[in-house]
Amino acid sequence: MHEIFNMLLAVFDRAALMLICLFFLIRIRLFRELLHKSAHSPKELLAVTAIFSLFALFSTWSGVPVEGSLVNVRIIAVMSGGILFGPWVGIITGVIAGIHRYLIDIGGVTAIPCFITSILAGCISGWINLKIPKAQRWRVGILGGMLCETLTMILVIVWAPTTALGIDIVSKIGIPMILGSVCIGFIVLLVQSVEGEKEASAARQAKLALDIANKTLPLFRHVNSESLRKVCEIIRDDIHADAVAITNTDHVLAYVGVGEHNYQNGDDFISPTTRQAMNYGKIIIKNNDEAHRTPEIHSMLVIPLWEKGVVTGTLKIYYCHAHQITSSLQEMAVGLSQIISTQLEVSRAEQLREMANKAELRALQSKINPHFLFNALNAISSSIRLNPDTARQLIFNLSRYLRYNIELKDDEQIDIKKELYQIKDYIAIEQARFGDKLTVIYDIDEEVNCCIPSLLIQPLVENAIVHGIQPCKGKGVVTISVAECGNRVRIAVRDTGHGIDPKVIERVEANEMPGNKIGLLNVHHRVKLLYGEGLHIRRLEPGTEIAFYIPNQRTPVASQATLLL
């Protein structure tokens, strides 16, 4: 009995050594990451198999010799590997351990039994991994280990040259080997404690993502470069990153942290890695690589931002040290990117709705603007006596202009030719007022055939006449041009007035305009929200040019009538 007790202590001693090694292994972040994953790559499975195979080989080497047999914890190593990482690890480890056990004692009493049960232990452990709930694996693992050791004892008795020798060996090593299988449960429980840490870490990451969302929510009400920069600062500070960036499909919208100076001189185009993430709609992780422009960065996480199923940008997280992108950080960042995507989509929808409301208000103002009606009626009354035909045409222009405005819907997409007809009616009335002072030139590409939101061009024409031509003493020219430009259509309004004040351009870009100039800012907002970039405003010598671009989406036209230029 004393000898059996000593052997049991030897088994627990070697199992304890394995537990200690595992304890230190799970302190290593890379190994802990393997434990957290639900699926592993072949390379990762190969690494884990090598670790548990070494445990199994060491168990055989350190075994206590007894009558041609070895008291060891080989089955514990094989079972633990299979239960924790799946059948491939268990079976391959079992085969390696079994072959090694056979080769070090070819022809030995226990060589064949140990070879057989080592492989069987790998198969059983793999089955436990696939079929048994995690909470029960440690218990079933103990039973599986005891079953394998019991089978080993039976095979030793059967395989021994004499039954007496087999029984003698089993009587000495059977109890220690079978009871030692309890250590399988200890190992599995140790790893499950890491799983508990994973769940706690996931809870912390979820709370962190929600905290960041709460802090950034007010900033998404009015999205601009400054608000996005503050969002990046909050994310960087809360997750202790070295740099954070947000991009759209072409440019870096905001960048905060290490390497920020690389994005301050207009060189803000996205990197090839970011382009790849957007093209494939997949997360890209680089854990040991230099960033595109910042060699100090060695870890990078690029997550696509989605709106209505389309990638509209990315969230990028950087660290100076390598291997900083953990699975928990990735999961948190993915959740955070989903929140940001939702907030951006809601913000865009709200701004579109607000712009549509302002456009409707602007249309209503045009409909009932007493000054416009007063001037139009004055022009008509003056023409009645001098030129009745002109007066009749002006009445027709005015009625068609008012009917067009009344029938408008919020951001309705209309044929660009229909929009230009409405502008011609407006200009006809204005030309009646200004006479020879106002000349309008139409530079329209007749091949252009697309749809645009209503009331995008008319406010620009009104701005050119009222703020460009009217203040001048002499004659003035307004040019309206529509032309194809690659895969887009360029729409521009140019006047020969005094030229726009540069401060007005700055205020438009900063979204700050007085109430009496809401038309220009409204068009800038709507174009930017709908097509990604706002108005292009240039001060000329003389005059001003305001242009914007829309996609060249050809649509069928009911009538092929051309504009009367």
UniProtKB/Swiss-Prot annotation:
Boundaries of every GAF domain copy: 223-342
Subcellular localization(s) per the UniProt record: Cell inner membrane
Molecular function as annotated in GO: ATP binding; phosphorelay sensor kinase activity; protein histidine kinase activity
Keyword Membrane set for record: yes
Keyword Membrane annotated: yes
Protein name: Sensor histidine kinase YpdA
UniProt membrane topology term: Multi-pass membrane protein
Modified residues (Phosphohistidine): 371
Residues that span the membrane, as ranges: 4-24, 46-66, 75-95, 108-128, 140-160, 173-193
Catalytically driven reaction(s): ATP + protein L-histidine = ADP + protein N-phospho-L-histidine
Functional summary from the UniProt entry: Member of the two-component regulatory system YpdA/YpdB, which is part of a nutrient-sensing regulatory network composed of YpdA/YpdB, the high-affinity pyruvate signaling system BtsS/BtsR and their respective target proteins, YhjX and BtsT. YpdA activates YpdB by phosphorylation in response to high concentrations of extracellular pyruvate. Activation of the YpdA/YpdB signaling cascade also promotes BtsS/BtsR-mediated btsT expression.
Stretches of the chain found on the membrane's Cytoplasmic side: 1-3, 67-74, 129-139, 194-565
PANTHER family: SENSOR HISTIDINE KINASE YPDA
Organism, scientific name: Escherichia coli (strain K12)
A GO term from the CC aspect: plasma membrane
Keywords: ATP-binding, Cell inner membrane, Cell membrane, Kinase, Membrane, Nucleotide-binding, Phosphoprotein, Transferase, Transmembrane, Transmembrane helix, Two-component regulatory system
Post-translational modification: Autophosphorylated.
EC numbers, comma separated: 2.7.13.3
Lineage: Bacteria, Pseudomonadati, Pseudomonadota, Gammaproteobacteria, Enterobacterales
Entry superkingdom: Bacteria
EC class name: transferase
UniProt xrefs under SMART domains: HATPase_c
Subunit text: Interacts with BtsT and YhjX.
Annotated Histidine kinase domain residues: 343-554
Biological processes annotated in GO: cell wall organization; cellular response to nutrient; signal transduction
Pfam families in the cross-refs: 5TM-5TMR_LYT, GAF, HATPase_c, His_kinase
